[in-house]
């Protein structure tokens, strides 16, 4: 084993690094006699040191596949940054596509939440993607993904596997709605431009059905171009002709939407719609319908059930759940101790089967410093069909000097 000794610069050697301290003066005759007595001592010591160095195993230039599969791939991604510091070989493995293919094959993938945040007060800033990262087994942090460019206001996004597809928006520089499409590879946080949509769209609806991306509205309602579909394999767009609901907003801008039961559910003021791309059919429900009654902005789908945050005094619960087969809302039980966040400005997402809510204790219109909190809720379905929830964690994940607006929250699998 090779050892490294440290030398101190304490003035005994004149302040010159790595220079040995000056030894006491010796008689030249004594030095000569000492050298004659042990002529091979120095050579033996050098040979011994060389032998120790030779016994040190070399740093591998390539990590064996069996080591990748058994030790690196099963690790949580939060450990990869430290692992990459060990050697260039580890850095190459962690930045390779092969590692993520192995993670998928052995079932070690994990959900990763991306949130698009804009800042509108006191000054406007374009949206940036933030990633919710787990620093250890319990601690969470919301960090900006600086390698990704700012997003256009009014864009929408869907996820397929480890990719986020961002479509449309409004370009303030040129004062126009756009048809831009970006593909974000969340394994490496890189993006590329795809073929533009056939129409410019802002504040559109988007959903993935049968592996294809459907984009609805985002422009004036017209029969022939209100819907278009993107094939991710051929990277081609096609317009989908009507019909559409006559109750839908003519401006084509909607409040919130989700994919549920292979349909795209859309909330528009007093009305609720469902678009079935397979049959090209629309369903419409009025303000008194069960579908519209408790659906609010902060909502998401888990296991084909729609969850939404509501004022507690309405239903006696903080979160309600909608089953499209039973066409009924029910309270999520077990959430008596619930953080008092500003939920009409929060954003809920499906995080690997759990509910994750990002929000603040103060309104975004309050110009003071904003602390962003994350609530993790585990879900459990009992034998009687009742859904129970448990707050697993409440974490302060970031603080901003300006008011954050949570535009989108999307979960990918990496």
Curated annotation (Swiss-Prot):
Renumbered residue ranges of the record's region Disordered: 1-61
A Pfam family annotated for this UniProt entry: Kelch_FKB95
Keywords linked to the UniProt accession: Kelch repeat, Repeat
Cross-referenced InterPro entries: F-box/kelch-repeat_ARATH, Kelch-typ_b-propeller, Kelch_1
Biased composition (Acidic residues): 40-54
Start and end residues of each F-box domain: 58-105
Kelch repeat ranges, renumbered to this chain: 163-211, 212-258, 263-302, 305-349
SUPFAM superfamilies listed in its UniProt record: Kelch motif
Biased composition (Basic and acidic residues): 20-35
Keyword Repeat annotated: yes
Name this protein carries in UniProt: Putative F-box/kelch-repeat protein At2g29800
